[in-house]
Amino acid sequence: GGPKPKAPGIGLLATVGDNFARAKALAGIVDAIIVDAGAATPEQIAELGAVVGLTASNHAAQLPDLKTLGADFVVIGLGADAVALRSDEGAKVLRLPLDTPDGSLRAIALLPIDVVLVEETVGKRLSVDELLNYLRLGALSSRPLIVTVDTDFAPDQLVSLRDAGIAAVCVPVERDDDLAVVSAFREMIDAFPQPPRRERGLDRSAPLVSIPTAAGTPLAPREPARPEPAPLPDDDEDRVQAS
């Protein structure tokens, strides 16, 4: 027997603005905390003892110095200066609206972007239409997707995002009361059931969700090499020529 394998979960992030008191309260609950870059000091970030991301201003000409501040990743918007993408420090998370055109999403593969964060916030319930829109962003950008959910979002809906291949959810924490909401989300994620078995046949040549490998391309089974035809023996070649 032994213990049952733990069900796969979903990442849990929180944004706290410049409120480091709330950030400290969340440090042992969430997988990463996002704070405003202008309000962060190296001492505050080190005190959190957590994975920390910084939100750059929308028109930033350069990214925050992640190494000096001790942060792990930066969140940028479409208005950021393109030169900021040249920085090789930490991971880059790009905020995108749901209505981003297909061509722009495909072009993300050419940029040093690690993760896509959806700008719009999901309300209390998740509709199939919304889910399809999120999956479009993830599939066309070939990047892991973070979905922002409101504090009113029903915790039992989190498993639907997990089953669809969403990498993580991000919760805006704007009040002290929101801390309890994030804790409830953590409890729900830790108690996730195993994903449902898919009974119908699947095309295994394409991944269910386009999450890139380290090389930046989705995993897919390799086609077996076709054997070369064996050469004809000399006497057979003579027989063919004679005929």
Segments from the language model and where they lie:
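Conserved N-terminal beta1-alpha1 strand-loop-helix module at the mouth
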Residues: 1-56, 221-243
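Structural motif
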Residues: 13-19, 35-39, 54-59, 75-79, ...
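A general structural detector for well-ordered alpha-helical segments in enzyme core domains, enriched
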Residues: 22, 41-44, 48, 62, ...
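Catalytic cores of alpha/beta
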Residues: 22-25, 60-68, 100-110, 151-169
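Glycine-rich phosphate-binding active-site loops on the catalytic face of alpha/beta enzymes
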Residues: 32-41, 72-84, 115-124, 162-184
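Conserved anion-binding
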Residues: 49, 54-143, 198-201
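Hydrophobic secondary-structure block in the mid-to-C-terminal portion of proteins
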Residues: 126-174
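C-terminal helical cap(s) of enzyme catalytic domains, especially alpha/beta-barrels
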Residues: 175-242
